[in-house]
Amino acid sequence: MPLSLDQRSLQAPWRIVDELIEQPSWGGRYIIDLKGLGSSEQWSGKKVGQSYELSRKAKLFNPADDSKVTLADLIASDPAAVLGAPVLTKFGADISLLIKLTQAKGNSFQVHLPEGKTLGHWEPKPEAWFYLAPGLFTFGIKLDKSFTDFSNALHKIDDCMRRLSDEVKGGQLSLDEAKQKTQELIASVDPYQYVNVVVAEADQIIDLTAGGIHHSWEEDNERFPDGNLVYEVQVDVPDERCSMRGFDKGKFLPDGSLRPTHVADYLATIEQDAEHNELSRHISKPQLLSEQNGAKVESLFRTPYFNLDRISIEAGAEYRDDASGGFHHLFIHAGNAQLGDTKLAQGQSYLIPAATGIYNIAATEKAAIFKTYLPV
């Protein structure tokens, strides 16, 4: 039966149900603490790597009665009122938007397919990052290095790991011995010599929406003990259809098996020209849009797929906006605020339906808010 909602519910913020992803190996406590869950028994002694602040499968609290409603059912109840007529016309009712808060300490060398190109089952996944604190990542390839040598190094590591994995599973080699042999090989071929290793600054923007650009998060526990703290916005595509791993950094699963790698496809997808691998083309800082009456608005992402602004509001000040052209997603990164009768709490996400139209946010304390919306 279709969900039936009165107009008042479609003119109020819908808080998105927390969806935290536990990651014992590379997560941390940042997300737990930001959301005020540090004393929760559920998260005692645990590490979280990501929280999904919006996804196709998201659930939301109905502002009328606090019942939980799926995003799909909410949209189906009145697509134009929820999403906005311009969004429906340009993007349709299936909003493939994924917004994540991430704490990560290293992942594989990856690449995503560029728009307009085809390769097997792979699909593009435009995404962009906003660094909340300093971190470490790799991005793009070095053009003064031999791509053939890079290719040979990755194939050599991958072939060796597959062989060692078979030996561990067959009982000929211990897992520790396989790890040691792998690390010795990685040190000897040094795949990092072929890619740009970048120290991220707080408030740095990384735009990966073009696709075809090598990237990875890195780990340096001495300089960056919290890893990479990143706010991500991306098109919602499952990893198995978009993330090509070229190098998984010598990681074995506990039984000696490996995560899937796709070295040939990864190498075939990387853009090798100077323009695509020019860091200044993809890395930037916030741009001021407006500042008045205690409220500052900065542009973070401007892409064909999604936009992201940061709104900073001084304590006691108000910020005015208009969602009538398309829904807004608000994530409260710092502080607390009030929107009508709804308290906007730090660490929480809210969907502002298009039917809300003009709305005012009053900061009860100094607040920082990320606003994601679609370019219409």
Which residues make up each language-model segment?
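His/acidic/aromatic-lined binding-pocket segments of jelly-roll/cupin-type domains
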Residues: 98-100, 107, 120-121, 127-130, ...
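Short acidic-glycine-tyrosine-enriched beta hairpin
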Residues: 195-207, 338-360
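Functionally critical, mid-to-C-terminal surface segments that flank or help form catalytic/ligand
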Residues: 261-325
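Transition-metal
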Residues: 1-174, 238-239, 246-281, 308, ...
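Short, basic/aromatic beta-hairpin or loop at an interaction surface
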Residues: 172-189, 323-331
